[in-house]
Amino acid sequence: MSPSIITAPGISSTVRRCIEKETGKEFAAKIIDLGAAETGDSNHMLEATRQEIQILRQVMGHKFIIELQDVFESDAFIFLVFELCRQGELFDYLTSVVTLSEKKSRYIMRQIFEGVDYIHSKNIVHRDLKPENILLDDNLNVKITDFGFARVLKEGEKLYDLCGTPGYLAPETLKCNMFEDAPGYSREVDM
């Protein structure tokens, strides 16, 4: 595959557009640099990435969730190959159009709700839903992505850890960090 960068590098990863030489088909490759982690953290990053891969495989096949095509591992890197969403992030789209008609808003929100409902039907909580983690394909169909904070829940399980993006945290998540007697949270933080 031949790469070109399509998003800004993250703390330990970069997403590049790649072309499969045999077919000419384009993909997005998330390249996770295990060497970028502090000593001892690379094992944690490796395990977290493997958990994300496992969750991506559990939600595979839904039309509003990003499709993981393949995974490659080396000693220093993990490559996650995804379908390419040419329109980029929902955040950037909303910024560029400034206003959105009620009809188009309903179209996008219905897809997000349908995707989240499917994720929840698999007993998974995403925990980092935001416009930056929702991609758009050529037809403006949404693709929920970035399952790095996602967790598979056991029946009746509550979570207490603080994770997600500060400006988008659900009140239930914040309560767990602020009050010792907080009841915990589950799938409701995705809504």
Predicted segment positions?
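Glycine-rich ATP phosphate-binding loop
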Residues: 14-36
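Conserved N-lobe beta3->alphaC-helix segment of eukaryotic protein kinase catalytic domains
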Residues: 32-60
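A conserved loop-to-beta-strand element in the N-lobe of protein kinase catalytic cores
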Residues: 66, 75-83, 91-92
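A short, aromatic-enriched beta-strand patch in the conserved N-lobe beta-sheet
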Residues: 70-71
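Activation segment signature within eukaryotic-like protein kinase domains
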Residues: 108-109
